């Protein structure tokens, strides 16, 4: 590898809005503030909610379906 052309690889901290602090290494060179992390994201915590579309699929099918010839 060529010397002097690669960015510095520094240790940084990524701080989540929930208070979780993650130490990692990066070429960014500054600490990061995160909105969500694996401690507070609904997918990882098991608190994921299913969004109900309120019958939109049925309403679409009713509106645009071709009447059956039975």
UniProtKB/Swiss-Prot annotation:
**What Gene Ontology molecular-function terms does this entry list?**
metal ion binding; rRNA binding; structural constituent of ribosome
User: Where is Zn(2+) annotated to bind?
Assistant: 16, 18, 37, 40
One Pfam family of this protein, by short name?
Ribosomal_L31
SUPFAM superfamilies hit by this protein? L28p-like
The record's listing under InterPro entries reads: Ribosomal_bL28/bL31-like_sf, Ribosomal_bL31, Ribosomal_bL31_A, Ribosomal_bL31_sf
Give me any GO biological process, just one: translation
Could you give the cofactor binding note from the entry? Binds 1 zinc ion per subunit.
Q: Which GO terms describe its cellular component?
A: ribonucleoprotein complex; ribosome
Q: Which UniProt keywords apply?
A: Metal-binding, Ribonucleoprotein, Ribosomal protein, RNA-binding, rRNA-binding, Zinc
Which co-factor is required? Zn(2+)
- Function, as annotated: Binds the 23S rRNA.
Oligomeric form and interacting partners: Part of the 50S ribosomal subunit.
**Family statement drawn from the similarity comment of this UniProt entry:** Belongs to the bacterial ribosomal protein bL31 family. Type A subfamily.
Record protein name field? Large ribosomal subunit protein bL31
Q: Which organism is it from?
A: Histophilus somni (strain 2336)
């Amino acid at each position: 590898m060529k010397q002097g052309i690669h960015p510095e690889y520094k240790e940084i901290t990524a701080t989540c809005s929930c208070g979780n602090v993650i130490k990692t290494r990066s070429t960014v060179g500054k600490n990061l503030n995160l909105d969500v992390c694996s401690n507070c994201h609904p997918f990882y915590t098991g608190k994921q909610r299913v969004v109900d579309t309120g019958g939109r699929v049925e309403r679409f099918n009713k509106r645009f379906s071709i009447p059956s010839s039975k």
